From Swiss-Prot:
Organism superkingdom: Bacteria
Membrane topology, record value: Single-pass type II membrane protein
Major localization class: membrane
Residue intervals passing through the bilayer: 9-29
Binding site for heme: 124, 128
Keywords tagged on the record: Cell inner membrane, Cell membrane, Cytochrome c-type biogenesis, Heme, Iron, Membrane, Metal-binding, Signal-anchor, Transmembrane, Transmembrane helix
GO biological process: cytochrome complex assembly
InterPro entries: CcmE, CcmE-like_sf, NA-bd_OB-fold
Listed Gene3D superfamilies: Nucleic acid-binding proteins
Function: Heme chaperone required for the biogenesis of c-type cytochromes. Transiently binds heme delivered by CcmC and transfers the heme to apo-cytochromes in a process facilitated by CcmF and CcmH.
Family the UniProt entry places it in: Belongs to the CcmE/CycJ family.
Organism of provenance: Bordetella bronchiseptica (strain ATCC BAA-588 / NCTC 13252 / RB50) (Alcaligenes bronchisepticus)
Record's protein name: Cytochrome c-type biogenesis protein CcmE
Gene Ontology CC terms: plasma membrane
Length: 153
């Protein structure tokens, strides 16, 4: 029969092992659910993954929005004023989606060079843009530094 001290040590070691296993599972789940953000310039420079999900952010180019006859399928272009990424999306758009306004689309790049969006996020205020999109546009020289408000990171 194990001594009291031996049982306690075994119990503590088992608890630490279970805690380490739980932490490893949580970290693995978080890593597999990460969706990275890229500007259109970075997408064209092949910095974005060729397979897997990522986000593209910028402005919806004026005059680029085309709706299909079904009313749900949409094609438009996201630009950082330097480069452009064509986007195809099927679904309901946010009410604030507009040409010339900020947008972040999540999805993956098709073999034909068209980004297949599974989610479209539009800005929610006339002075707001997601921080990553604002930074990408500033780097491209499309936005003055004080034009937009962004969330605290």
């Amino acid at each position: 029969m194990a001594t009291r001290r031996g049982r306690r040590a075994l119990l503590i070691a088992g608890g630490v092992g279970l805690l380490a296993l739980a932490a490893a599972l949580v970290l693995n789940a978080l890593r597999s659910n990460l969706v990275f953000f890229f500007s259109p310039t970075q997408v064209h420079a092949h910095e974005a993954p060729s397979s897997g999900s990522f986000r593209v952010g910028g402005l919806v180019r004026a005059g680029s929005v085309e709706r299909a006859a079904d009313g749900l399928t949409l094609r438009f272009v996201v630009t950082d004023t330097v480069r452009e990424v064509p986007v195809a999306y099927t679904g309901l758009l946010p009410a604030l989606f507009r040409e010339g306004k900020g947008v972040v689309v999540a999805g993956n790049m098709g073999a034909d060079g068209v980004f297949r969006a599974t989610e479209v996020l539009a800005k929610h205020d006339e002075n707001y843009m997601p921080p990553q999109a604002a930074d990408a546009l500033r780097q491209a020289g499309a936005l003055p530094s004080a034009t937009l408000q962004t969330e605290a990171r």
